[in-house]
From Swiss-Prot:
Protein's name according to its UniProt entry: Ribosomal RNA large subunit methyltransferase H
PANTHER family assigned to the protein according to its UniProt record, in alphabetical order: METHYLTRANSFERASE (PTHR33603), RIBOSOMAL RNA LARGE SUBUNIT METHYLTRANSFERASE H (PTHR33603:SF1)
Gene3D superfamilies: 3.40.1280.10
Compartments it resides in: Cytoplasm
Key words of the record: Cytoplasm, Methyltransferase, rRNA processing, S-adenosyl-L-methionine, Transferase
Residues that coordinate or bind S-adenosyl-L-methionine: 55, 87
Binding partners and assembly: Homodimer.
Enzyme kind, highest EC tier: transferase
Family: Belongs to the RNA methyltransferase RlmH family.
GN (gene name): rlmH
Catalytic activity reported: pseudouridine(1915) in 23S rRNA + S-adenosyl-L-methionine = N(3)-methylpseudouridine(1915) in 23S rRNA + S-adenosyl-L-homocysteine + H(+)
Amino acid sequence: MLLHIIARGKIARSPEEELVTRYEKRLTWPVKLTELPETGGRIPDPQTPFKTVLLDERGKDLSSHRLARQLERWRDDGMRETRFVLGAADGHAQEERAEADLLLAFGSATWPHLLARAMLMEQLYRATSILAGHPYHRAG
C-alpha cells in the first residue's frame, strides 16, 4: 500500500527536511511526497481504492500501535493508497474534514507545519516497523 503524504508549502533545506528524508529512506513500504503551493494546486488523482487521513488538531490521538493496526486493516482490505494530507496554516475546510476517512492529531498541541510533517514520517516508519516485528518501537 502506498503511503502518500500531501502537504502545503515547500519544506526546502531545513532540519525538518533532513528528518523527513531520513525516515523516508528507512520505510520499506512505498512512500510518495507531494508538495502543493500554500493556496491552489491540484492534489493528484489517487490509486484506487484509497483512504484519506487529514492531520487536524480536532482529530483522534492514536497510539503508534493503533495507527499500525489501522494501516494493516486498510492494507488487508485491499486499499492501494493511503493519503495523509497536511493543510495550509488555516487547516482544512469543513468539507475536507467531512470527506476524510480519519482525522489524525498528534496530541492536543498545535505543531509547526514542518515539524508535523517530520513527525508524520516518523510515525509511519514506526507503524510499519511494528507491523514488520522490527525492534525500533519499544513498547513499555
